[in-house]
Structure formats: C-alpha cells, structure tokens
Amino acid sequence: MTIQHMEEVGYWHQAHSFVRGNWRNAEESSPMILQKCCHDMDIMLWLADSKCESLSSFGELSYFTEENAPEGAPAYCLDGCPHRDECAFYAPRFYLENLDGYLVCAVTDQTDPEHVLEALKKGPYGRCVFHCDNTVVDHQSVDIKFENQVTASFLMTAFTDQCARRIRLMGTKGEIKGDMDAGTIEIRDFVSGNLETIELHTPANGHNGSDMSMMHDFVRMVGEGRKGKTDAAVSVESHLMALAAEEAKITGQVVNLRGFANENK
C-alpha cells in the first residue's frame, strides 16, 4: 500500500559530482532528480506494479552556495584556505587520501600525488564547494500517487555519510525493508510476527554489480535475439516521473503525469 524510499547521495559524492563535477549545473546537464533518481522512480514503478497518476515535490539548493562560504574562503582550496583543517571538502585531502578510489580518476588520468595536486590548483575539482557554478538541488522530496492507489514517499539528500539506497514496503500482510549498503532484505509477517532476513552477496563496485549484470543481459538479448524483461517504455515512464517531479518542484503544484506527458510530446 505504501512505499518509503530514500536515496542517500553522500556528502562526498554530492561535492564531487553535483557541486564540482559534470552534473553540477542543470542547464548544462539535467535536473538532479532526473540524473540521480530516475533509477529510484523505476524501482518504485516496478514495486507498485502500476503507472504513476500524480506527484508533488519540494527541493532546494540550500547549503552549497556563496552565502554559506566561510569568511576568507578563496575560490580554490589551494589558494591558502584558512578553513582547510575543519572543512570536510578540502580538495587536497578529499582526493589525495583516496588515490585508489574512482573519484580521483575524474580529476586527472595521472593519479600520482604530484599530478593530482597540479590538477587541483586551477581545475574544477579543486574549487571551494561554496564558490562553484552549481545549480542542482542538494535535497529534494517527492510524494507519488499511483493509479492503483499505492502511495510513495521519496527523499534524496546530500547530507549523509554513506552513498546508499534504503527502502520500506508497507503492505496489508507485512512489511519489507531493504538496505542496499548493508545488502539485506528484512521481511516481517504481521500474523506470525516472524522476521526473515535475507543477505545479498553483491559486488561492492559498479552499482553493486548491476552495471555488469545489465551489460551481460544486453549481450545475451542481442546474441539470442530475445526480448528483455522490460522495454524502453518503462524507462520512459520513470524519466517522465523525474521530469514531472522537477516541474512540481518549480511550480509548487501537484502534477498529473499523463497531462504532463501530453503537454511535452
């Protein structure tokens, strides 16, 4: 009957990709609710087993703005920032302490300390997070009504430690909780009171193995000439939901999805 779903972006992922990185500016890329959360819309569509009827949304870019820059903070971290010791986003520490991570590969293709530091001096990833040209939100919520009367509440926020998805499905006979980061699914039966925990053993990289799984499935479909479990129309529906959520955020109104789709053909 009800879905509660949260996209925990992670403070470090937000800073890297959506404040300093390629997806920081909605005019140059797309709204964050589309680029980061169309997958979440897809998950909720599949679980609700129904098309979206209408939705509302609220969100803001509240923290990563010029107004919140500490006094004396320069445009680039390496220009003598007086707040480097207490700033979670100080670029040299942010990237140099994670030279083996994938984030630093976006800074430069030569990931030794010398080249990373050089790239941070005047490159986009060396900018103060409060002095960037970012326009996408750092938190947004969406309330969804499906055609079969299932309702869903979705939250996307930058202000978390982990980058993860957590979901709760509330039904008439029990509830299910899913934790992508922990790799667990909990099933509670209302009648017996029994709790079943399922542990999922998935790879830590590539979106928990889903990137490779999609490619394997695509190759099999091409090689065997068969159809996939879903078609492009389902992906279009989830993208429409994300775009309609952005429209609802901007206008402050409840958006009917079919009407929105017809108006934007």
Q: Language-model features: where?
A:
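Generic structural "secondary-structure junction" signal
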Residues: 20, 25, 35-36, 131-132, ...
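C-terminal helical cap and adjacent loop that interface with cofactors, partners, or active-site loops
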Residues: 136-265
